[in-house]
């Protein structure tokens, strides 16, 4: 399944929109803010013969407000702080917001008025850059900072988990799970390695000398790709989908043949791909854990399901139909509420963050 036209966050600002339900991603951005600040400020102590007059910043898979606006604010404030420390003139800042064509860029750009009001004395500009980050997006040596939060773990296509005869090997599931065949994990891991390598390979010529890239991925802590905290969401939705199959609302074949184009890598997997691809040196790498169990905003099943729905619904509705989405997520909420009572829900959100520096003296074909 080609996903370039169907992977995007829920549009607009309605009840089930990404705008209203992106709280977890904002927590991830806040938790990783020091790493982003350090990467931004390192741009001002490289081999540049003169202070930068323009800083070009790309946000890959930006989605829509409030996530990219928060990242944008961190970049601006980091540059203001560093220029104040060095006593140098503030450069102009050009933000390039990248996502697939299906992204709701209109809602994103409407939110820029908040940033404009907040940073009246900073000269910044914004533009959209639609396209896939699995290919080239920008001119050579043009970007000083590339940033991406919770995007590059999405795959360019769904992993093919079938037998030699073409029969599905992950029946009743939409992601890896404890009951999945070993082929499911191998196919998904191989797809991630291929796609992540392409992200690195195509960014390398686009980054200026001494350019930095900050990537934040939804990942996992252990070597086990089926650990509970990363598979819980997809197991929950698979159980709800199985219920819809039993009710005759969707075809069983549609469920058995479907796998989400998503992969939660470990820190070791991310570092291994970076080293193998060879375009970047790793300046910083870490696994960041957010507790989402207990008494917090996600302890309400309804709010948690909205958080899941805002990013998973577009790809699910393409496979199973928009007409069953309300029933699907209502059932998922019902299952989640029961899991809460039994203490079976996921309690952690895992992020992998890496800060990369472009290697010098490279040639590209």
Swiss-Prot record:
Pathway listed: Alkaloid biosynthesis
How does the cofactor bind to this protein, according to its record? Answer: Binds 1 Mg(2+) ion per subunit.
Query: Mind telling me which Pfam families this protein's record contains?
Result: Methyltransf_7 (PF03492)
Q: Where does S-adenosyl-L-homocysteine bind?
A: 18, 62, 67, 99-100, 132-133
Query: Which positions in this protein are listed as binding theobromine?
Result: 25, 150, 153-154, 311
Q: Does the keyword Magnesium apply?
A: yes
Q: Catalyses which reaction? A: 7-methylxanthine + S-adenosyl-L-methionine = theobromine + S-adenosyl-L-homocysteine + H(+)
Q: Which cofactor does it need?
A: Mg(2+)
Q: Does the keyword Transferase apply?
A: yes
* UniProt enzyme class: transferase
This entry's Enzyme Commission designation comes to 2.1.1.159
Q: Which domain of life is it from?
A: Eukaryota
Residues at the site labelled Involved in substrate discrimination: 147, 218, 262, 322
- UniProt GO MF annotations: metal ion binding; S-adenosylmethionine-dependent methyltransferase activity
Q: Which UniProt keywords apply?
A: Magnesium, Metal-binding, Methyltransferase, Transferase
According to its UniProt record, which protein family does this protein belong to?
Answer: Belongs to the methyltransferase superfamily. Type-7 methyltransferase family.
What is the stated purpose of this protein?
Involved in the biosynthesis of theobromine.
Q: State the protein's name.
A: Probable 7-methylxanthine methyltransferase 4
